[in-house]
Structures are given as C-alpha cells and as structure tokens.
Regions:
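Short loop/turn segments at secondary-structure transitions that flank enzyme active sites
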Residues: 54, 111, 142-144
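Conserved catalytic cores of phosphodiester-cleaving nucleases, focusing on short active-site segments
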Residues: 94-112, 126
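Active-site-adjacent loop/helix micro-motif of nuclease/hydrolase catalytic cores
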Residues: 112-119
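Short acidic (Asp/Glu) and glycine-rich catalytic loops that position anionic groups and cofactors
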Residues: 28-32, 105, 151-153
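Metal-dependent nuclease catalytic cores that hydrolyze phosphodiester bonds in DNA/RNA
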Residues: 1-101
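Hydrophobic/aromatic-lined pockets within catalytic cores
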Residues: 56, 109, 131
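An active-site-proximal "capping" alpha-helix that borders the catalytic cofactor pocket
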Residues: 120-131
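Metal-dependent nuclease catalytic regions and adjoining charged, substrate-binding loops involved
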Residues: 6, 10-11, 73, 80-88, ...
Length: 200
C-alpha cells in the first residue's frame, strides 16, 4: 500500500465510525474540504461539553451531574490531543474530554445510554492513542428526559487490556484501508497527506 504513490491517511474514530456505518459523505468530508453543517444536537453537545470542562477545571472534580468524583491529575481536551503513526500509510488522531491518570473520560449527550457505547470501538481507538489507560468511562446525559427520570444520567466503564488494543488496531487499519482506497479511487488521493479539514 505504501508503494501506491499516494500519501498516508490521517483518521479519527469519528471519521472511521461514519465510514463503518455507511455515512460516506461525513467520512469523506474532511478530505474533500467540505464542512458538514452541525446539527442542533451537535451544537447542544458542544455547549454542554464546554460547560462540563469548565466545571471540572474549576473544582478538580467530575461535573456534579456525573457524581462529582474528585479527579487526581486531570488533563482536559486541548491538552490531550494525540496523533499516532500506525504504519507508513495510516495515522490515528484523537482528543479525550478528560484524561485522569490511567482513566479516560468521555462525555456524551443524547438518547443513547452509556452501556450502548461499550459495543463501539471508541475506547479501543483511544487505547491506541493512550496506551497507558486502563479504563474508559462513558458519562452520558439524556437531555430529552427530565432530571428525575430513570436514564437521565447513565455511566458505563470499559476495561482495557492487550486484547482490546489488538482488536482496536485491527479495526482501525481495516476501516482506514477501505476509506483510503475509496478516496484514491474517487479522485481524493492528493488530499490524503495535506491535513486540511482534519479534526483538531
């Protein structure tokens, strides 16, 4: 693959997840220089993430909404960005909401309960970027429910090991190879290494 005359592809979990779900437009958009208009739900999620980060920074704890657990040595979103070279044709990038020692924390909004994310590859992708993490916590707030309703707040934990790391690498390389081939075959091969429009 490295000898095909095209550059390496840089991917993130969200790009690969879009590809895996068949949302080709969203997966290809960063390489085509197309900005996808954020949905109302995405805008709401962004605002909540900003508010939760501000609260956690100020008090050194998880947001009260998620139990207020004391954080030991937290790093927040901008300080957690990582890019990792997996081979000569694939780079993986990502940003955690919170990295607290060997614990990764991801905030979610929307109707999906935390337990459903355990079936995703998200925690395995982030383990590739942060090999020292031992557990990945999903903290979810379903703003479609009232605070007192069951399911308003859900939390799920994925425990990470050598097997999850191997599984994650296999998935990333499989999805990235498919996406890279699609981009090359559809006239975007020259965009692979430019980095324009990649998630920050």
């Amino acid at each position: 693959m490295a000898n095909d005359g095209y550059g390496a592809i840089r991917v993130s979990y969200s790009i690969l997840n879009s590809w895996a779900k068949g949302d080709i437009d969203r997966a290809v958009a960063p390489y085509a220089g197309i900005e996808i208009e954020p949905t109302e739900a995405m805008e709401y999620g962004k605002k909540k993430h900003e508010a939760w980060e501000k609260e956690a920074r100020r008090y050194g704890r998880l947001p009260r909404r998620f139990g207020g657990r004391k954080l030991i040595s937290p790093q927040f979103e901008l300080n957690t960005k990582k890019i990792r070279k997996l081979n000569d044709w694939c780079y993986l990038s990502g940003v955690l909401d919170v990295l607290d020692g060997d614990v990764a924390i991801d905030y979610k909004t929307g109707k999906t309960p935390a337990g459903d994310y355990l079936n995703s590859y998200q925690h395995e992708c982030y383990q590739i970027l942060y090999p020292n993490i031992k557990r990945f916590e999903y903290h979810c707030c379903n703003h479609h429910l009232r605070r007192k309703d069951d399911g308003y707040i859900t939390v799920a934990v994925a425990y990470l090991n050598k097997q999850t790391l191997k599984h994650g690498i296999e998935w990333v390389l499989t999805m990235a190879a498919e996406l890279r081939e699609y981009l090359i075959n559809n006239g975007y091969g020259d965009k692979l290494d430019q980095g324009k429009g990649f998630e920050k």
